[in-house]
């Protein structure tokens, strides 16, 4: 319902869409790169501060939220956060989600259910017509209310829960 790039028209200037990516693994990095190529203004967050340079190298802004001590496994995966850290993360992301046109969540913890990061309260604060893509829906989802294989509309925000997005473009996947 909204164009991604900034456009100058005879009727005026259309500002670029704002995209917020949560989780900067392989899927998150691809989401950042794609949104930037399409002309969006992109911000990204991950509990692993070591990915900041990767986010910046793609032209996005890395969102810093002080969660205290966060770690990653030897394989580079994020470790589970405490309840207190999750609350801090949600508080830090609340304003960013509210001002974003698109939120893409990819956060998963190896061997565990995906953390619920986007609360229904955060969804309610988003602008009408905003879209959330929950790419972690197959392991429980990052968004309250997301359902696997469905597009759910909550408070005029569309939440897309699709565990097999590559299957939507089989020729290229």
Show which residues each predicted segment covers.
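Short capping/connector residues at structural and topological boundaries
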Residues: 12-13, 19, 82, 86, ...
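Short, ordered loop/turn segments at secondary-structure junctions
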Residues: 47-49, 67-68, 108-109, 136-140, ...
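A structured beta-alpha segment of the ubiquitous adenosine-cofactor-binding alpha/beta core
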Residues: 73-103, 107-121, 162
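ADP-ribose/adenylate-binding Rossmann-like module
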Residues: 102-152, 156-160
């Amino acid at each position: 319902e909204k164009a991604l790039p900034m456009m100058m028209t005879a009727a005026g200037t259309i500002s670029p869409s704002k995209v917020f990516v949560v989780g900067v693994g392989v899927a998150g990095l691809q989401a950042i790169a794609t949104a930037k190529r399409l002309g969006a203004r992109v911000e990204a967050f991950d509990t692993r501060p070591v990915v900041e340079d990767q986010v910046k190298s793609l032209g996005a802004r890395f969102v810093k939220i002080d969660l205290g001590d966060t770690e990653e496994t030897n394989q580079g995966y994020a470790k589970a956060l405490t309840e207190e850290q999750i609350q801090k993360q949600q508080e830090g992301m609340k304003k960013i989600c509210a001002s974003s046109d698109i939120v893409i969540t990819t956060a998963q913890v190896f061997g565990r259910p995906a953390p619920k990061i986007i609360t229904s309260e955060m969804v309610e604060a988003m602008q009408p017509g905003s879209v959330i893509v929950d790419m972690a829906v197959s392991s429980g989802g990052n968004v309250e209310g997301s359902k696997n294989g469905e597009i759910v509309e909550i408070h005029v925000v569309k939440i897309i829960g699709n565990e097999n997005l590559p299957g939507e473009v089989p020729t290229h996947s």
